[in-house]
């Protein structure tokens, strides 16, 4: 029996990166419309169930993101200060964890690439990377289920009406 995830979506253990997942989804809308929505992390909680809260942190390029994972009766919360560290309108965006304290923190990274397809819509690729030691098989299963739901919600957000329903 084959793995339920396609090869590109399987978690990979790489040197220097504990977890890396590639998520691909096709969306209706122009690259500019999709980019405008995906460049703001506050919008991500509309489709990603493991994002509990997102608050801006002194501007439009940094956010305090609270992640929440529940495995059975156990829940874990994790707060991250995420910063948009790179953007190339309308092709790509990269967010990275950038805490302001002097402590050493695990890396979190989200790289979004938007490619216009011939005809209508775009292909969007999101690469999520985490270098911390607290990842586990149960968390992987929770994350994967949220990703599958997020794909559907994203497609609904960018339905064939020509653009995002998020402002």
Q: Predicted segments — roles?
A:
Residues 53-55, 83, 109-113:
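Short, surface-exposed charged micro-motifs
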Residues 30, 59, 89, 117-120:
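Short strand-connecting beta-turns/loops that link adjacent beta-strands
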